[in-house]
Structure formats: C-alpha cells, structure tokens
Design a protein with these regions (language model features):
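Phosphate-ester processing/binding pockets and catalytic centers
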Residues: 1-368
Length: 368
C-alpha cells in the first residue's frame, strides 16, 4: 500500500469536511485499548462466523498530555492500592446495567476532571463485512450510505440465514456462475424485510435496494465481491492500527500491548513522504495507568454503541425508563463525548451505519 498517498488523501478529505490544519496536524498523545477484537471476520469450517451480528470493535481511549500514577488511578476508581483494575470485573452487564455501576461514574468523573478527550475508531463488524456488496452495485456515494445501513439492518435481523447465503457462495469470492443466484437470494431477503417492516421510509430504501440488486444482475462483474479471499468477510483488524499510524504522523500513539498486532506492524514498513514512521509504541496495561483508563473507557463505549444500534424510538423508550442516577451518568457520558467532538471531529471515527451515527449525534445533542 502507498501509505503516503493514502495519508495525503485522508488529510485533504478531512480538511474539505471542515477539519482545520491545526486539528489534523497537532502534536499530541493518544492512548489506546481495544475491545471485541475478533482479529478478522471469517466463515469457519463448521459454517458459522467467528463474531455475532452485534459485534462491535472499538479501538480508542483518551487523548491526554498529562498522566496519572497507579496510586492516583486506584484512588479515582475507589480501589485499594495494588488491587487489579479490570473493566471486565467492574463493568459487567449491558449498557443500561452498567449505568448503575460506580465504576461508570468514577471513570468519566476522572476523564472530565482532567479534561481529557475521548477518541475512538468504532467498527460495526457485520456492517463492515457487507459494505462491499453496496459498493459493487451502487455508484452513487450518498445513496450508498443509506443502502449500506438498510442492508446491515436486514442481514443482521436473520443472522443464520445470512451466514447460510453468503457462506454458500464463499463471499466475497462470488464466482461468475453463481452471481445471479447469489443476487436472487439477496433480493429474496430484502423482499421479505419489505413485507414485514412497518416504517414507510425503510420500505422505500429497501425497494431502492431491490432495484439496485436487479440492475447488478446485468453487470459483467461485481467489483468488490469477486476474486477476493473466499470466506474472509473482514480482513485482519491490524488495518485499524495501521490507519491511525499513517493518517496522523504527528501524533504520539501509545497502544496496549498486543503481540500479534505488534508483530504484523513490524513486518509492514509504514512510510509517509519517504520517512518511516515511528510515532507509535506498545505499553503493558499492567504497568501503564493511562492504558488502564482506556480499558474502562472503551468497554463503556462498546456497550453504548451496541445500545444505540437500533431505531431512535426504541432507544428513547429505554432512556425514558432511566432512574435519576442512570440519567445523571448518561448525561455525563454525553457531556464528555460532546466536549471531545467539539474540540476535534477527528476524535470520532466510525465504520458504522449512518443510522447509528445519527442516533449517537442526536442523543449527544439532547443529553449532553
């Protein structure tokens, strides 16, 4: 890959969307942890995939120029010195359930008091797995975003049927002889959805998808879902680490130790403008309190992103059931998110349905 070329394109695109040069090029330190990393999404020999339809990979944490000691972090989280800090222990349960956890309050009280910014890459794994279908049948970029969102909703609504259809034809390596029958199967799923969904806008978008599928049957090739690695729905997740490194060469990036990721990055020389990048390092969470903060932050974010991956009406119905404590903590989360986004739009990076992104933004504006 020509990383220098991709860096230039990413930078130009960000500037065109209103990001300032200062925001893009600023020298600052970003700390990272990850959650729900299935390494890649593949069809296994037993004809199932290695991640659920709700899988949500988050690589992120906090941007901070000041750090805290291990003792300070234990105090902030209300823990005895020397006690292990793990979000998996302190934040068990769904998003609604962890709003009752003391660790939720303490984590974002700390982030807010320090004025650290939250940053993340959020990947809806099943969404990312199927975007190439739309990119192969639709040339209209703006329309494609909405078609990807409705396709994602349709395919995750019946995951076993989806795995059966896509697995049968070894997606994303659809052979020429199977192209029509694969598209027929996809069309049948969309028509079934149209027959059951009550929302007129959803029916309309799904109907447009049917039209695009039928038009694709006349194409000579489906560019992005043929002649690819069979049964590999999403390539290795190391790509998300690489993207952070080459997109923002002025940043100092500190990742939680991940031996496989570290090995793969070592094998891949990342150069921008003729210079090999050394703007990143790996640090053991057991000895780096900032990585431990990120562990708590990304754990909460992942649960929140799953919570908002549905219709806005369904989400609001649940929010209206929050008790006083839950609502106070939910507002705190949105306050931190909004402050971070206002400081720099680049703190948030979505590979996700536009519907989910819309939900997050609407709720952030209302509850921050």
């Amino acid at each position: 890959m020509d990383y220098g070329r991709v860096y230039q394109l990413n930078r130009l695109m960000a500037l065109a969307q209103g990001v300032s040069e200062e925001q893009y090029d600023k020298r600052e330190t970003w700390y990272y942890d990850e959650t729900d990393n299935v390494k890649h999404l593949v069809l296994l020999p037993e004809k199932r995939v290695n991640a659920s339809e709700n899988a949500c990979f988050v690589l992120g944490g906090v941007q901070a120029e000041d750090i805290i000691s291990d003792d300070e972090l234990h105090t902030a989280l209300g823990k005895e010195p020397g006690r292990e800090l793990k979000s998996t222990k302190d934040l068990r349960g769904s998003f609604v359930e962890i709003l009752r956890k003391d660790a939720f309050q303490r984590t974002f009280d700390l982030v807010e008091s320090k004025r650290w910014n939250v940053h993340f890459i959020m990947v809806q794994v099943w969404y990312y797995a199927f975007v190439d279908v739309i990119d192969s049948i639709c040339d209209d970029v703006m329309l494609a975003h909405n078609l990807k969102a409705i396709l994602y909703r349709i395919l995750k609504s019946s995951p076993e049927e989806t795995v059966k259809l896509f697995g049968k034809y070894h997606y994303p390596d659809i052979k020429d002889k199977d192209k029509i029958v694969f598209l027929d199967g996809l069309e049948a799923k969309v028509l079934k959805f149209i027959g059951t969904v009550p929302n007129p806008p959803d029916k309309m978008m799904a109907s447009i998808l049917v039209k695009k599928i039928n038009e694709a049957k006349k194409k000579e090739e489906l560019t992005f879902i043929q002649d690819e690695t069979p049964d590999e729905w999403v390539k290795m997740f190391v790509q998300f680490y690489s993207a952070e490194i080459y997109s923002y060469p002025n940043r100092t990036l500190v990742f939680d130790t991940e031996k496989q990721v570290e090995k793969l990055l070592t094998e891949d020389t990342i150069e921008v403008n003729g210079t090999k990048l050394n703007n990143y390092s790996f640090s053991d969470s057991a000895t780096n309190p900032m990585i431990q903060v990120c562990d708590y932050v990304v754990s909460i974010l992942r649960k929140y992103f799953i919570f908002v991956d549905r219709t806005l009406n369904e989400i609001v119905a649940d929010i209206e059931k929050f008790d006083k404590q839950q609502m106070q903590r939910y507002r705190l989360l949105n306050k931190v998110l909004k402050r971070s986004l206002d400081n720099n739009p680049l703190f948030f990076h979505y590979i996700a349905s536009v519907e989910t992104q819309y939900n997050i933004n609407q709720l952030m504006e209302k509850y921050a």
